[in-house]
Design a protein with these regions (language model features):
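Boundary at the C-terminal end of the N-terminal hydrophobic targeting segment
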Residues: 15-17
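Charged, solvent-exposed structural "stalk/scaffold" segments
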Residues: 45-78, 83-85, 98-141
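Short, charge/polar-rich alpha-helical segments
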Residues: 32-50, 87-99
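Amphipathic alpha-helical coiled-coil segments
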Residues: 85-99, 138-154
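Bacterial N-terminal signal peptides
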Residues: 1-9
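Short N-terminal segments immediately surrounding and downstream of signal-peptide cleavage
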Residues: 19-40, 44, 161
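Terminal, low-structured helical/coil segments at or just beyond the last alpha-helical repeat
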Residues: 152-163
């Protein structure tokens, strides 16, 4: 019985560590983003938006560290990633800026989805994790499409040329 207990204590962390997934370069790039600087001349609203972004970024980094140590699960990372991306988009007021940020996020989602599909096939991640990621990606694509539509509606319609 003691031998079994020792085996669990000694080898279980190793088994957990082996199941930690490799993350795509774009995901790791997001996690290396520095926090936003709070400036004295920030409006109260902008300051709060920056604080929210920084909180989501710090949580993402902390959860990633927990994940690497086997102390949290992939859905927690996907969820905080969604909050981080949402907070980043909300930093921008102009639709063109929002579209640019959403396009960058879509690149991250595409790379992460491809990576996660491989992990599901290898038995290292669940189909449920992949579907959660796909749901978030589809939500982002809807936001991007709506943003692009609002940009095109702001553009003046071309005037017919006089004959």
């Amino acid at each position: 019985m003691l031998a079994m207990l020792l085996w669990v204590i000694v080898f279980q962390p190793c088994a957990r560590a082996q199941r930690v997934l490799k993350f795509s370069p774009k995901v790791l790039e997001v996690l290396s983003t520095p926090p936003l600087e709070l400036k004295d001349d920030d409006t109260q609203l902008n300051r709060l938006k920056k604080e929210r972004f920084n909180a989501a970024l710090n949580e993402a980094k902390a959860r990633f560290d927990l994940y690497k140590r086997g102390l949290t699960k992939l859905p927690d990372l996907i969820e905080v990633g969604q909050r981080l991306f949402s907070a980043e988009v909300d930093l921008y007021d102009k639709p063109e800026d929002r579209a640019r940020v959403l396009e960058r996020h879509l690149e991250v989602y595409n790379e992460a989805e491809e990576n996660l599909e491989k992990h599901v096939k290898e038995g290292l991640a669940t189909q449920a994790d992949l579907e959660q990621l796909r749901y978030n990606k589809a939500s982002l694509e809807i936001d991007l499409l709506n943003t692009r539509n609002s940009i095109s509606q702001q553009q003046p319609a071309p005037q017919p040329s006089p004959h």
